Amino acid sequence: GGENDMYYYSEMWQGWIDIFKSVRQARAEAGKDLWINMTCYVHPSPWWLQYVNSIWLQNSSDIGFADNLEHQPQLEREITYRDGRYYHSLCTRAWQIPQRYLYNHEPIYGTEAKVHYTDEEFEKYLYFNACRGQALNELHLSYTMMNKTKWRILSKVVQWQKSNFDILRN
């Protein structure tokens, strides 16, 4: 937070609110919908949901690995790290925002992330991400790491998540 752990809203935030309203209105007038994902330096408050569809969960590195599982496979350490960050936000800090409105950088399967999964591990990783119930998944993928099987797995998991979102979102 700011001084004395207090947050405040400034002219900058009012400007963003005006922009959110304007672009949403312009799309509505064109008969189109719009997804607004609020990503930088935002307070994770449900108050923002009157203007945006999702809010970035800014409480961790883009990718990380749990330290307490040092003898476990990389996949398990990555899933546990991210689950720990969600637990910290939603349980320890008791953020009052439904998880489906949170956005995070995941899934990440790219060269810069230094992860390498078998097809089976990749599938498990994607299902763990999907089961968290977010409405927005940004796919951080390096196409050079993908093979035909991984592309099929990705398609299968995305379709499964869409088909089950009415359950997963809660």
Located regions from the model:
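Generic detector of multi-pass transmembrane helix bundles and their immediately adjacent loops
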Residues: 7-11
